[in-house]
Amino acid sequence: MFDIGVNLTSVQFAKDYHQVVNRAKEAGVLGILITGTDADESLAAQTLAAEYPGYCWSTTGVHPHHASSWQDSVEQKIRTLAATASVVAIGECGLDFNRNFSTPAQQEVAFTAQLALAAELSLPVFLHCRDAHERFIDLLVPWLDKIPAAVVHCFTGNSDELDACLALGLSIGITGWVCDERRGLDLRALLPRIPVQQLLLETDAPYLLPRDLNPKPASRRNEPCFLPHIVQQVAAWRQEDPNWLGQKTDENARRVFRLV
């Protein structure tokens, strides 16, 4: 199994990230993708990934919350990081109209620029979309034939949005959100509709600790070592063998991010 979304640069992991990685290995997680969310965090993610060659990789990009920071100097930093061996995707980039920490216009500029960069460098994109599906798709579609792969990280959309993403050939990242009986039931019901070759699994650690995890860590902090729980639950809801699903989603991650 492969965790395609870990925020290992979070301050929550600052004191024990090495132990976090070791616990993931001991739990049977075979690889980790560390998420970059702005220029500084992308550098930190790349630095961490380089400490674990062949086990950790990273993305480099600017999250829509930080889109107001996008400028030529930031693009150059992202471009430079993208040339390093441990960086395998542009992102986390996209649109988030839920809280608009950056204006929609700023988000669209940063998103489009990063799609162009991914196309130029022939890198996959690691995507974020919240409350912005139609505009997200409008901006993404013109670039899809120029980009080797696209992953919708932490998908939480509805049935129509899932169908649209699947029809475009996007890979779908599923987190412990589906383990939340308060807000994840609708998405849980959609899990069997995702073709296995388009399914990826992730923790989004330290966030989104699965609510049905028992026992829960005293810290209430999510970690990649809990990915096996997500695999088990998703497999049960899809009526598939968890070992098989863990292997298939690991293969998918390595194919999408060209780690094979």
From Swiss-Prot:
Q: Which domain of life is it from?
A: Bacteria
Q: Name one Pfam family in it.
A: TatD_DNase
Hydrolase as a keyword?
A: yes
Q: Where in the cell is it found?
A: Cytoplasm
Q: What is its EC number?
A: 3.1.11.-, 3.1.13.-
| GO cellular-component term (any) | cytoplasm
Which residues make up the binding site for a divalent metal cation?
A: 92, 128, 153
Q: Which residues form a coiled coil?
A: none
| Keyword line | Cytoplasm, Exonuclease, Hydrolase, Magnesium, Metal-binding, Nuclease
Q: Kindly report, in one word, the top-level EC class recorded for this enzyme.
A: hydrolase
Q: Which InterPro entries match?
A: DNase_TatD-rel_CS (IPR018228), Exonuc_TatD (IPR024918), Metal_Hydrolase (IPR032466), TatD-like (IPR001130), TatD-type_Hydrolase (IPR050891)
- Keyword ATP-binding among UniProt keywords: no
What is an example of a GO molecular function annotated in this UniProt entry?
A: single-stranded DNA 3'-5' DNA exonuclease activity
Assembly state and interactors?
Monomer.
Q: What does the UniProt function comment say about this protein?
A: 3'-5' exonuclease that prefers single-stranded DNA and RNA. May play a role in the H(2)O(2)-induced DNA damage repair.
Similarity section: Belongs to the metallo-dependent hydrolases superfamily. TatD-type hydrolase family. TatD subfamily.
Q: What is this protein called?
A: 3'-5' ssDNA/RNA exonuclease TatD
